[in-house]
């Protein structure tokens, strides 16, 4: 199953292995412009942009999309996608603690490991 990436970030190797496809070219630029809000948006702007993003996804003939970003936008985007028969998914990651020895010093970092997707139910 192909999952179209509708986030502003490139899919990770783990996500690609699970079927995520990144947008490219003009479609990527259009999507990023629609997802970038400068200043406080009106409800009308939020809904118009959600509609446009959903229309972009529909043009790619996919059943599922990976979404994520500004919380105030996600609800409108979920509904716009579902009205077009497209299933919105959120990536789910687990934080993994990793210890590395660098110059005889143990450095502990957190990395995020992609586990799967959470389907939106309305």
Where are these regions (language model features)?
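Long, low-complexity, Lys/Arg-enriched
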Residues: 1-64, 76, 83-122
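Conserved residues at the C-terminal ends of beta-strands
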Residues: 68
């Amino acid at each position: 199953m192909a999952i179209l990436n509708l986030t502003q970030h490139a899919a990770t190797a783990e996500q690609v292995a699970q079927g995520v496809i990144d947008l490219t070219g003009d479609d990527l630029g259009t999507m990023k412009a629609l997802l970038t809000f400068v200043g406080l948006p009106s409800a009308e702007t939020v809904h118009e942009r959600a509609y446009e993003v959903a229309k972009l996804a529909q043009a790619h003939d996919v059943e599922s999309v990976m979404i994520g970003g500004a919380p105030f936008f996600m609800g409108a985007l979920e509904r716009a996608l579902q009205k077009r028969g497209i299933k919105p998914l959120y990536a789910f990651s687990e934080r993994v603690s990793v210890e590395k020895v660098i110059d005889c010093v143990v450095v502990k970092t957190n990395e995020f490991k992609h586990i799967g997707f959470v389907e939106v139910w309305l």
